[in-house]
Amino acid sequence: MAQTFDVVVIGAGPAGYISAIRAAQLGLATACIEEWRNPAGEPKLGGTCLNVGCIPSKALLESSEQYEHALTGLGDHGVTVTGAKMDVAKMLARKEAVVAKMTRGIETLFRKNKITWLKGHGKLAGRAGTGWRIEIGHAGAAEVVEAKAVVIATGSKARHLPGVPVDNEIVCDNVGALAFPEVPKRLGVIGAGVIGLELGSVWRRLGAQVTVLEALPTFLAAADESISREAWKIFTKKQGLDIRLAANIGRVEASKKGVKLDYQLDGKAERLECDRLVVSVGRVPNTDGLGA
């Protein structure tokens, strides 16, 4: 007989795990389904934000800022730093430690509030009386639970461009761009939104030559004009990003040697050659395989 809960939450990102904790605090028998696994294959809570989004990106931003400050920010104090080196492996290990500490915190809250953590891909499998049947699949096996109510908190995933295959080694979305094993000499970024600017800033501070291609003719078009204008100064003059607006992306050719990207700018055919390419053109709902 299937396990029965008052509430089942599909997704353990910021919306999902908080919903599950609150439901449990209100006395409801609660389960939370999460399919995320880290590169070692270990199941983890926290969703995109905690594992491959907000938290690790801020950890890398802090590390890269410290490195840049050591090189260029101490002159007014009479301090000159020479021979400074960035240990990328150690920086990435620190990032993973920050993430691990926070995921353990969520696990502790789940145990404290007696929330059942179901590991796998959750999908609706039809009605069960006035409630729902939910199927949890993992590694070819599946189990079914029932719930009086279901909270869908499956978040979003990176939008990919047609004809631009992402392997998260040479051509990357946020997942791959947070885990480069070394600083690329030349980094291309498609998209000058928050994600593209953050990731571009990280690797630029560490020494990469970063070129950002943005389809819109206006920088940060959704922001207030004064904010956009100041941000442009910060990212181009202070951070050193080469941002090219109104760039129409064409053919992208990737190999182990790098990427060749053809695009149109001001009516002229241009080509960008880089060692790695980050595709950051927004997010789409993560609703594949959610069921009826």
Model-predicted segments: where are they?
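Beta1/beta-strand and adjacent pyrophosphate-binding region of the FAD-binding site
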Residues: A2-A15, V183-G193
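Glycine/Thr-rich phosphate-binding loops of Rossmann-like dinucleotide-binding domains
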Residues: I18, H160-P162, D167, E198, ...
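Active-site substrate-recognition segment that forms the wall
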Residues: I195-L216, K233
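FAD-site-proximal beta/loop scaffold in flavoenzymes
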Residues: D167-K185, R276-A292
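Glycine-/small-residue-rich beta->alpha transition segments that form the dinucleotide
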Residues: A147-A149, A153-R159, C274-T287
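Conserved phosphate-binding and hydrolysis motifs of nucleotide-dependent enzymes
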Residues: G11-G16, G155, G191-G196, G207, ...
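Glycine-rich flavin
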Residues: A2-F5, I21-L28, C32-V183, T211, ...
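N-terminal Rossmann-like FAD-binding beta1-loop-alpha1 element of flavoenzymes
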Residues: V7-C32, G196-R205
